A protein has these predicted regions:
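Preference for extracellular/luminal or secreted protein segments
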Residues: 2-5, 13-73, 284, 293-294, ...
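N-terminal small/glycine-rich loop or linker at the start of catalytic domains
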Residues: 44-58, 118-137, 180-182, 217-235, ...
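Acidic/histidine-rich, surface-exposed loop or edge segments in extracytoplasmic proteins
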Residues: 50-58, 78-85, 185-187
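Second-shell residues forming the walls of enzyme active-site clefts
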Residues: 67, 83, 92-105, 111, ...
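Catalytic domains of carbohydrate-active enzymes, especially glycoside hydrolases
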Residues: 72-86, 162-167
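Glycine-rich, aromatic-flanked loop segments that form ligand/cofactor-binding clefts
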Residues: 104-132, 152-176, 198-222
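A charged helix-plus-loop insertion that forms the helical arch/lid used to bind
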Residues: 131-144, 188-192
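Alpha-helical scaffold segments that flank or form the walls of functional sites
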Residues: 144-165, 246, 323-324
């Protein structure tokens, strides 16, 4: 075990063993928190803050579809921070462009319009609708230099931006330490088993997108590459297969200031969570102590889809929301894939509002997440490319 991870474990054990944070005057601080909560509730800001923590999928591919109309209303009311596209939402490139234009037109705050466009097997926009596809990460790393990959990824980012997307939920920086991994290695979703090579290609991906005003998200923290199971379908425990070298791409990219968002994985890693049954996405030790305190990540932490079976088969909806936020997630994704629920934003708001009214620590978490998300959106606004390039047809 490296000295670096050993230091993390020592710090985490110390912090997690404290029953309450040390304060100079806990009574006075409690009064201040209660006053802040009262003001937030009175002026309606609590609901608005929670809205910036919820990113949802929707059913429909035209402005006339009920699912689209619903998210437009939620965006207008400030109940969501953004949307995520799946294949079901894409009928044509022009239709997507108009959907995104409508969403931003009515939103009270700029929306994150997200998509998984990694390349290879994982891309929602395909050649079938005239979108120029890109190779998988594995193929890119085998056939191109990082400089050549940068050109490919700049074209990708430009195409996404022209359609109204401002967040690509990629790159995958998991190490390909298990080529038989059903959700990473077998699908060609990893650049390499070499941390330095992964970092080089991921940096090319990130910088290319940033140049075109598109945010990116490193995934899947703290590492999904060694798993033997798919967390979409249930528990994926990497405790015995994971090693701390899987943190290196995250650590080095964060240290260089190149990371906007980190996506939390639903894998179980007892080496980091100090529990045999807590997924990384619900683990304070993993997301707050390791990622925030030890690795000094200052950006936005976003969950993987909270409706994946690794979560839904093992934790109630209410508990998953509460635990995810307290663990350190700033945004929760609900892709609404297999069992769409248009009421998700309202349900999340009810759960978090009630908890915040009785738990000052939850209020602090909501406020911190809101600040993180709004800082991200301000950065997006200052970086958005003014290009009007039409997406190149296949």
């Amino acid at each position: 075990m490296s000295r670096w991870i050993a230091t993390f474990i020592a710090v985490a054990c110390t912090l997690l063993g404290i029953s309450a944070p040390l304060r100079a005057d806990p009574v006075a601080e409690t009064h201040v928190r209660k006053a802040n909560l009262s003001r937030a509730v009175e002026d309606g800001r609590l609901r608005q803050m929670i809205g910036q923590m919820v990113l949802v999928g929707f059913v429909g591919d035209s402005p006339d579809d009920d699912g689209y109309k619903r998210v437009v209303k939620q965006a207008e009311a400030g109940e969501i921070t953004g949307v995520i596209y799946l294949g079901r939402n894409i009928s044509s490139l022009e239709a997507v462009r108009q959907l995104n234009k409508g969403l931003q037109q009515y939103a009270t705050a700029p929306l994150l319009v997200a998509i998984d466009q990694e390349g290879g097997r994982i891309q929602r926009l395909t050649g079938e609708v005239g979108f120029k596809e890109v190779p998988s990460e594995a193929t890119v790393a085998k056939t191109m230099s990082p400089e050549e990959a940068s050109v490919v990824y700049q074209d990708l980012a430009s195409d996404l931006s022209s359609l109204g997307f401002n967040l690509n939920l990629a790159p995958v920086v998991d190490l390909n330490v298990n080529p038989s991994n059903p959700i990473i290695g077998k699908l060609g979703r990893s650049f390499s088993a070499d941390p330095q090579k992964v970092e080089a290609y991921a940096r090319a991906f990130i910088e290319a997108h940033r140049a075109k005003g598109v945010l990116t998200a490193l995934k899947h923290f703290p590492g999904h590459g060694s798993s033997t199971k798919d967390s979409h379908k249930g528990i994926a425990d990497v405790t015995k297969t994971w090693s701390d070298k899987e943190l290196l791409p995250f650590k080095d990219l964060i240290a260089s200031g190149d990371v906007d968002i980190v996506m939390a994985a639903h894998v179980i890693n007892a080496k980091l969570a100090f529990s045999p049954d807590i997924p990384a996405s619900l683990s304070r030790a993993t997301l707050t102590v390791l990622l925030r305190d030890n690795m000094h990540f200052k950006g936005v932490v976003i969950s993987d889809d909270m409706q994946m079976q690794a979560i839904t088969d093992n934790v109630s909806f209410e508990d998953s929301v509460l635990r995810a936020v307290m663990a350190g997630n700033d945004i929760l994704i609900f892709a609404n894939d297999k069992h769409p629920d248009p009421e998700i934003p309202e349900k999340v708001a009810a759960i978090l509002s009630e908890e915040a009214r009785r738990n000052p620590e939850m209020l602090d978490r909501i406020k911190t997440s809101y600040e993180n998300v709004m800082h991200l959106k301000r950065k997006l606004g200052s970086a958005v490319s003014q290009e009007t390039t039409v997406v190149r047809e296949r």
